[in-house]
Amino acid sequence: MTEHIEHPQWYLYILRTITGALYTGITTDVSRRLNQHQTGKGAKALRGKGELTLVFHCLAGDRSNALKLEYRIKQLSKNQKERLVQDQPQTLCISDTMY
């Protein structure tokens, strides 16, 4: 008998710092991760950056897909990321033409 193992859903998220910089990451719990970043327990790149605002998040599938999607988004220019934030698509696919 085989057991069905439930794998968590992953999300891609983008945060904006008070200086307008955008930070992209992945997580299984967006609220928890935002709280970690805001309390200095998240990415070192965001420590001391002041208030953070969640400006975008979407379902990214499994961890492997989320990592690939995160890489693709991090390769975008700031203007392309801003367009993504403005458009607020519900889902993103690795194969999609990126902004």
Curated annotation (Swiss-Prot):
**What PROSITE patterns does UniProt report for this protein, alphabetically?**
GIY_YIG (PS50164)
Pfam families associated with the record: GIY-YIG
Q: Which residues form the GIY-YIG domain?
A: 8-83
What highest taxon heads this organism's lineage? Bacteria
Instruction: Identify the InterPro entries for this entry.
Output: GIY-YIG_endonuc, GIY-YIG_endonuc_sf, UPF0213_domain, UPF0213_GIY-YIG_endonuc
Return the similarity comment.
Belongs to the UPF0213 family.
The UniProt entry, under PANTHER family, shows: UPF0213 PROTEIN YHBQ
- Protein name per Swiss-Prot or TrEMBL: UPF0213 protein PC1_0597
Q: Whose protein is this, by species?
A: Pectobacterium carotovorum subsp. carotovorum (strain PC1)
Question: Could you read off the lineage of the organism from its UniProt record?
Answer: Bacteria, Pseudomonadati, Pseudomonadota, Gammaproteobacteria, Enterobacterales
